[in-house]
Amino acid sequence: MYKNIIFDFGGVVVNFNPRDFLMDHFMNRRAEEETYDIVFGSQEWQDLDRGIITREEANKIMLEKAAHANRVFEVQTCLDEWFTMLETNKTTVQIMRKLKAAGYRLYYLTNIPTDVMDELRQREWFSLFDGGICLLYT
């Protein structure tokens, strides 16, 4: 019988859908695609996920790319507001509460960067976890 359940954050406990975020903000397919490529689809975003670059370094490079593509406004908007797309997945949290009440121990395993992890620790559901591992902590 299982006693421990492991959850990821992005796309499980919190929603992460950059394309919807871009559509809600810009409603222009070309702007959305170019901005996606510069931010969420970039090597810098992957490097940030791997913990080999800081948010400041990644942002600087992305803004330089944005300047060349004439997308500074869009990219800066993403860099300033992307956290807002990390809405709590209420269904997952309900399941977590039921599992906890049934005696299961809950853990997280994630690669979310430090600044995001710090913000998630403030959410009311974070205390449901008995522990966890953040694979990077830059």
Regions found by a protein language model. Name each.
Residues 1-41:
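Active-site neighborhood of HAD-like aspartate-dependent phosphohydrolases
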Residues 8-11, 51, 108, 132:
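Generic structural signal for small/hydrophobic residues in well-ordered secondary structure
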Residues 31-48, 78-90:
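Helical cap/lid subdomains and adjacent loops of hydrolase enzymes that gate the active-site channel
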Residues 46-78:
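A metal-dependent, Asp-based hydrolase signature
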Residues 73-107:
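Short, acidic loop-to-helix structural element flanking the phosphoryl-transfer center
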Residues 100-101, 124-128:
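Short, conserved loop/helix-junction motifs that constitute active-site signature segments
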Residues 117-123:
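Distinct, well-ordered alpha-helical segments
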Residues 137-138:
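Conserved small/polar residues in nucleotide/adenosyl-binding loops
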